[in-house]
From Swiss-Prot:
Pfam families (UniProt xref): NUDIX
Organism in which the protein naturally occurs: Acinetobacter baumannii (strain ATCC 17978 / DSM 105126 / CIP 53.77 / LMG 1025 / NCDC KC755 / 5377)
The protein's name in its UniProt record: RNA pyrophosphohydrolase
Function: Accelerates the degradation of transcripts by removing pyrophosphate from the 5'-end of triphosphorylated RNA, leading to a more labile monophosphorylated state that can stimulate subsequent ribonuclease cleavage.
Nudix box, short sequence motif: residues: 38-59
NCBIfam families with a match to the protein in the record: PRK00714.1-1, PRK00714.1-4, PRK00714.1-5
Gene: rppH
Enzyme nomenclature, EC number: 3.6.1.-
Family note: Belongs to the Nudix hydrolase family. RppH subfamily.
Top EC category: hydrolase
Signal peptide feature range: none
InterPro entries per record: Nudix_hydrolase, NUDIX_hydrolase-like_dom_sf, NUDIX_hydrolase_CS, NUDIX_hydrolase_dom, RppH
UniProt keyword annotations, A-Z: Hydrolase
Record domain Nudix hydrolase: where: 6-149
Length: 161
């Protein structure tokens, strides 16, 4: 599902533990780390997509997390030209994302990366809240910064910039 401007609706997930650290996951087959994220399917609300992606990508169920906050609006990033498939119709030029801050309320052993076929991630770790800003691929960095700044005041443990 791509909107009239060429952006694919998507949800981004910042999952925090009791210490204010966030889940940082490595994409399978790549040396690229990111927050879990995924597309919103036709007829889904952002919250429904959030819970579907949470289950598919990291094995968590709604009862394993608490929604703390979400971004007020959509945050957009454009894909680099090398990632744009100009032969597709419609052409996707980027993602528009609704970001959610979640608190893990279950033991971390519930996190499972192997439920999707194929899996999205092959490794994960807890990192400090601001660590991802220096690590994420450049074209996503501005959206990460905007989402993290907007959501940081709602963290279970304060992690102000």
């Amino acid at each position: 599902m791509i909107d009239s401007e060429g952006f694919r609706p998507n949800v981004g997930i910042i999952l925090a533990n009791d210490d204010g650290q966030v889940l940082w996951a490595k994409r399978i087959g790549h040396n690229a780390w990111q927050f879990p994220q995924g597309g919103i399917q036709f007829g889904e609300t952002p919250e429904q997509a959030l819970f579907r992606e949470l289950r598919e990508e990291i094995g968590l169920l709604p009862e394993h997390v608490q929604i703390i906050a979400q971004t007020k609006g959509w945050l957009r990033y454009r894909l680099p030209h090398r990632y744009i498939r100009s032969d597709s119709d419609p052409v996707c030029i980027g993602q528009k994302q609704k970001w959610f801050l979640l608190k893990l309320t279950a033991p971390a052993k519930n996190i499972q990366l192997n439920l999707a076929d194929p899996p999205e991630f092959d490794e994960w770790q807890w990192v400090s809240y601001w660590y991802p800003l220096g690590q994420v691929v450049n074209f996503k960095r501005d959206v990460y910064r905007k989402a993290m700044v907007e959501l940081c005041t709602q963290l279970p443990v304060q992690q102000l910039p």
